[in-house]
Amino acid sequence: DVFKSLGIDDAKSDMVMDQCLKFAKNYDDINEYEQAAHNILESEGVVDAIPEKLIERAEIIHEQIKKYLKDGLVLDFGCGDARLAQLIAKDGNEVQLADVYENPNVAKTGLPFELLEQGKDIPFEDNKFDNTLLLTVFHHSDDPIQLMKETKRVTKPGGRVIVIESVYDVDGKELSEDERKKSEEYLALSPEQQRRVNIFFDHFYNRVIHNSDDPSKKVNVPFNFNTPEEWKKLFDEQDLKQEEVVHLGPDQPTVPEYHTLHVLNVEK
């Protein structure tokens, strides 16, 4: 379904995956495998199809989160290509971009950008932002708890932190009937199998499809996945009060992980 969403037919999808799996079983260095698999995907047009799908992904997420944004300054932490931030800015919010590397599209947005250092404190003063977005970010952090503390520090009292996370150990009961039907293969898996699916797609999407020769541009993949309940417990411990959780399910065809949206209020 991932390749189908990119316009790749079933026969070619099978061939591409067979080649990638062949490399996966016979590599001496993980970086060599990632590059070899990336080259296969690039030769078959998979990589070139991604940018258009990222526009669709930004539009999907924008619809999911826009009603939760408060008026004022928004920090898009882990902004990626900043396409979502552009949509938020068009709504009238002032947006600050931040990420560990600068995507080529960032400069085209005209929005302010701050280059982050992996594992370092967020380089903004206390109580600066009305909204802080961390959209599929926490599971890429080596220390999600410290990142939560920093997120709370830079967000105003009463401000809002909006999180989307890839989760596991879900049964889909919160989804509509149509959404459950689309997700039935994933939902039939055990919790550990769901976690492993997340690991596979997280690595495949971030380190194979988006492979880079530059070590500083390789996405960090420590696979810090949690269940929705475990995320809530961690948020509570940092006085990030969960006002609402929305089960989005496998809502993004190019990244078919089960997502939940967490709307948090900053208590200080």
Predicted regions span which residues?
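Conserved alpha-helix/loop element of class I SAM-dependent methyltransferases that forms part
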Residues: 51-71
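A conserved beta-strand element that flanks and buttresses the S-adenosyl-L-methionine
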Residues: 133
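A short glycine-rich, Lys/Arg-flanked "PGG" loop and its adjoining helix->strand segment in the class I
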Residues: 145-157
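Class I SAM-dependent methyltransferase Rossmann-like catalytic core
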Residues: 34-57
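Short catalytic micro-motifs in class I SAM-dependent methyltransferases
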Residues: 136-137, 165
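Class I SAM-dependent methyltransferase SAM/SAH-binding core
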Residues: 79-121
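Conserved class I S-adenosyl-L-methionine
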Residues: 71-80
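C-terminal alpha-helical "lid/dimerization" subdomain adjacent to the S-adenosyl-L-methionine
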Residues: 164-238, 244-251
